[in-house]
């Protein structure tokens, strides 16, 4: 029997942008308990950002050494409106991936007339861009509409990729015209700090994980062996 724990709060600290009130207060104790029984995977939410990370007890631990994996699922209400798909296969392996809610296909199939639904991806991007443009307008008033739009598009693109757990091309973003406008017009703003935090936190993709059967079985065998060695001689003999 394999146990798959699921919780709201996070097991591991997985964001440079959100550094407080995300991981459990007693996460160290929970990690120790779950790893005692060689649990391979932990699922959580709360952060609203798609993340995957393996716990390492200390720096320098080998990449193939056991450590519980945590998948944080992003909020389906935030573009690109993803949800997670976890397949627990007959061979014992676990495969995780993400899918986006295809609102446009549903809208066409059900003959909806709302153009926002028919082009849901485009509407979602425009919605985020407008939201950021309004925030820019609230803190700076001496930039033209084209500059504001360029800044908003840059922020929105990073925002969507960040929450979706995608790898972000840091160099590409920071050499873009939109980012240049951010540095020039709002160098000390919290929005630029957030933009940089999202870029720095997105150096890899977080949308796929495969835990092969042999990995899971090895971890379970190691736990059973350790449990047997901790038991008394008579108990170990019965096992």
Task: Label each residue range with its predicted role.
Residues 21, 57, 86-89, 112-114:
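Generic alpha-helical propensity signal that fires on short helical segments
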Residues 89-239:
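A short C-terminal boundary segment appended to hydrolase-like catalytic domains
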Residues 1-16, 85, 90-103:
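Conserved catalytic scaffold of divalent metal-dependent phosphoesterases
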Residues 1-69:
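His/acidic metal-ligating clusters that form di-metal
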Residues 74-77:
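Active-site PLP-lysine loop of aminotransferase-like
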Residues 79-83:
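Short, surface-exposed coil-to-beta transition loops
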